[in-house]
Amino acid sequence: MIRRITERASGFAKNIPILKSSRFHGESLDSSVSPVLIPGVHVFHCQDAVGIVAKLSDCIAAKGGNILGYDVFVPENNNVFYSRSEFIFDPVKWPRSQVDEDFQTIAQRYGALNSVVRVPSIDPKYKIALLLSKQDHCLVEMLHKWQDGKLPVDITCVISNHERASNTHVMRFLERHGIPYHYVSTTKENKREDDILELVKDTDFLVLARYMQILSGNFLKGYGKDVINIHHGLLPSFKGGYPAKQAFDAGVKLIGATSHFVTEELDSGPIIEQMVESVSHRDNLRSFVQKSEDLEKKCLTRAIKSYCELRVLPYGTNKTVVF
């Protein structure tokens, strides 16, 4: 069951005109100005109960904020509650630290499993590291989206188990923007996971942009934060290597790409985003691969953007809610 509530901000106070006369020597009778309103996002996950939406809405309204959109999801036959609200507020009247405290009070009341606030104009961008192997089409797409301001992240470094020449487009781009590139040579016997953990220890999450190495359970536990992968196939079908060939051999009529959270089980983590494109008997393996690559880069950047905008929440043991 999905409940959606949408409100639009309207009727904000406008500047009061300045009244001038010889008596007041041109001074304003009222020098007030409209407040500077900034956007915020809040996500909430708890056991379902009566009055949660009212409490969260009242919290925003009581501080002079205004809700622009409110999404709620309560799964059928499952006593859990998910919500995501977008609102605007005056940070002078409602300081950033107080926003966290007020929502935390509600979280404690309902025993929330998740309550997160993000204010993009104040909060630092998420720090990420990108891991990849030989192919760089997903990396290039992410770098261009980041350069255009369409990907709200701070790319701390790029790590690869393949060395790249300094005169390539990717390396010149990274050098121009001051993004470190780390070549970490790996073997079947030594995946250099301790070295990678040291490089990414200060990041908020990791992105595997076609990193063709399986991360161990020890690595995932040692990192302790989310890792997002792009798989060049439509999961849960065609797991593992060469999914385009698997799909081609199976005679599918849709080819796809899947972005998902990484777990210890290969290509089996909760799915964040999937994209598909039609194929036919006229396609060959080469066109399958080309279409797959086009989908991969779009699918991955969309998943990262959704994650940064707090649209992705864990649901059950292996699902996600994506608002």
UniProtKB/Swiss-Prot annotation:
Keywords associated with the record: Hydrolase, Mitochondrion, One-carbon metabolism, Photorespiration, Transit peptide
Function: Deformylase involved in photorespiration. Prevents excessive accumulation of 5-formyl tetrahydrofolate (THF), a potent inhibitor of the Gly decarboxylase/Ser hydroxymethyltransferase complex.
Compartments reported by the entry: Mitochondrion
Lineage: Eukaryota, Viridiplantae, Streptophyta, Embryophyta, Tracheophyta
EC number: 3.5.1.10
GO molecular function: formyltetrahydrofolate deformylase activity
Annotated catalysed reactions: (6R)-10-formyltetrahydrofolate + H2O = (6S)-5,6,7,8-tetrahydrofolate + formate + H(+)
Protein name, UniProt field: Formyltetrahydrofolate deformylase 1, mitochondrial
